[in-house]
Each structure stands twice: as structure tokens, then as C-alpha cells.
Amino acid sequence: RLYAINPENGFFGVAPGTNAKSNYNALASTMKNTIFTNVALNNADNTVWWEGLDKNPPEDATEWKGAKVNGKEYTSVIGADGKPQKLAHPNSRFTAPAVNCPCVSPEFNNPNGVPVSAIIFGGRRASTTPLVYQSFDWTHGTYIGSAVSSETTAAAVGAVGVLRHDPMAMKPFIGYNVGDYWAHWLEMG
């Protein structure tokens, strides 16, 4: 039986678009002991803000590059790219302790690990691919995972939304030869 531990102690998330409706637990996790990068600061109450958090940019704001601006006016200006200016960088992030998450499992820090019953490779696709489907066996699942394609995000250099081959939806994190990486997955099964 395969057991797993979580080698991380928290969540690293993209801030823009995260709100109480889109991801309540992620937002709740950021309420204390959290590091934010490249978000806007609401100078009136010393809180953070990003696009998609709510529809009310702070009037007294410091945008992600450090300029003090009226957030409502700033976000209504169309930039050189033909889009409204952003108070937060499109790839702004938060890092929050997992213990802050309202739904964290009591087994989260079990030193013996927890039994694995499924592995999900989470690529980003706006269309044409089912959100979830099940493989026939470990080898088939490894093959399917290796064939995942994802659309680029603000985290990647270049245009956003471009489809690229993204093995196991882990391309930015595969630190060695991808063939060896795939062989490792096959060997584990």
C-alpha cells in the first residue's frame, strides 16, 4: 500500500480571483500568519487587496509596484495592453499555514502518513478535456498523466492561455530528465 506525507506545511496560492465564493477555504486560510507577494495594500486599514477579492478596490492603495494610488481610479484606466490596470500583479501569491484551513484533516501531520487511494493530476484547460476521468490501472494512469496539456498562466513567461505539453501538470517542478521522472512513476506502481 502506498502512503504519503505532506512535505509542505501550508498552501501557496495565486491571489487574483481567490475570494469567499471561488475558494472559501483558501481565503479563510489567509486570515493570519500569511505572506502575501505582489498584492495591493489598502492603506486605510493595512489589509491586502487583489483583483477578484471583491469589486471594491481600495481608494487609498499602494499598488504592487509600490506607487500610492486611488485604487478605484487606477483600475478604471486602460493600459497599453488594452486592459484595465491592475493593483495586484496577475501572478501575486499568498503562502498560508495549513493549520489555518477550516477543513484540514486531523491526519494532516500524521508522521506515519496516510493511505493513498487516488492521485489527481490537475492541469488547467478551459475546454475540450473532461475535468476528471479514471485510468484503468497504474501504468495507464502514468501514461495519461505524462500526456497532460495545460494552458499557461501568469506564472509562466509569455502569453497566458497558450496550450502546452505539461507532464503530470508538473512541468515547472520537474527538476531532472522527464523520461527518468516518468520511469520513476512507473516503478512506484
Identify the function of each model-found stretch.
Residues 5-7:
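Conserved, well-ordered active-site substructure
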Residues 16-17, 24-189:
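Conserved NTP phosphate-binding and transfer environment spanning the P-loop NTPase/kinase superfamily
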Residues 1:
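Glycine-rich phosphate-binding P-loop
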